[in-house]
From Swiss-Prot:
Compositional bias per record (Acidic residues), positions renumbered to this chain: 196-215
Family membership noted in the UniProt record: Belongs to the bacterial ribosomal protein bL25 family. CTC subfamily.
Gene Ontology cellular component terms for the protein in this record: cytosolic large ribosomal subunit
UniProt protein name: Large ribosomal subunit protein bL25
Matches recorded under PANTHER family: RIBOSOMAL PROTEIN L25/GLN-TRNA SYNTHETASE, ANTI-CODON-BINDING DOMAIN-CONTAINING PROTEIN, RIBOSOMAL PROTEIN L25_GLN-TRNA SYNTHETASE, ANTI-CODON-BINDING DOMAIN-CONTAINING PROTEIN
Native source species: Chromohalobacter salexigens (strain ATCC BAA-138 / DSM 3043 / CIP 106854 / NCIMB 13768 / 1H11)
Subunit-level organization: Part of the 50S ribosomal subunit; part of the 5S rRNA/L5/L18/L25 subcomplex. Contacts the 5S rRNA. Binds to the 5S rRNA independently of L5 and L18.
Lineage, broadest ranks: Bacteria, Pseudomonadati, Pseudomonadota, Gammaproteobacteria, Oceanospirillales
Keyword ATP-binding: no
Amino acid sequence: MSQFTLSAEVRHDLGKGASRRLRRENKKVAAIIYGGSKTPQPITLEKSAFYKAIEDEAFFSSVINIDLEGQSEQVIIRDIQRHPYKALVTHADFMRVDATHEITMNVPLHINGEEACKGVKDEDGVLHVLANDVEISCLPGKLPEYLEVDVTNLGLGETLHLSDLPLPEGVSLVALSHGEEHDFGVVSVTRADTGTEGDEEGGEEATDEDGEKSE
């Protein structure tokens, strides 16, 4: 599990006007920490450090340490609000985590073995990724950055489902807790859709130059 640390300051100046001033200064990002037994805490984050952190995919599936004026807060990112047309983050939401309580979180899927995939390499199929991430439940200390999906032995016409994913100890898939009918496909190999020449030729023969049906 990656360890991310961000420095933050308590945000005393609140409201829309304060948020606009903060954006105009272009040095800080407004955010809030909530959850647990503590009250919600508005904060500001140093912009360049935060922007660098969110470039890393693992940031969104990791426990993050926020150093709030000398006090440590263990959190996960819950939401990022972006400007509608500028490349700016306008606000971020962080949720406190308790080491003894499970959390639910979406983690990305990393597909391995694409080039060696049996259904693609030997059977001329096409690999289809049906899900880019999955929702898991675990203790904060067990949170994986991602889950691996090995497609090396996946053959033509076959599908890997949620139940086929290897999970780290202490990690479960939220969807499967709702029953077998939620065992969705994650990746599959199907026959390449090359089209049929007959269909195209038939379309040309179906009408004459005047648009009337040919015999």
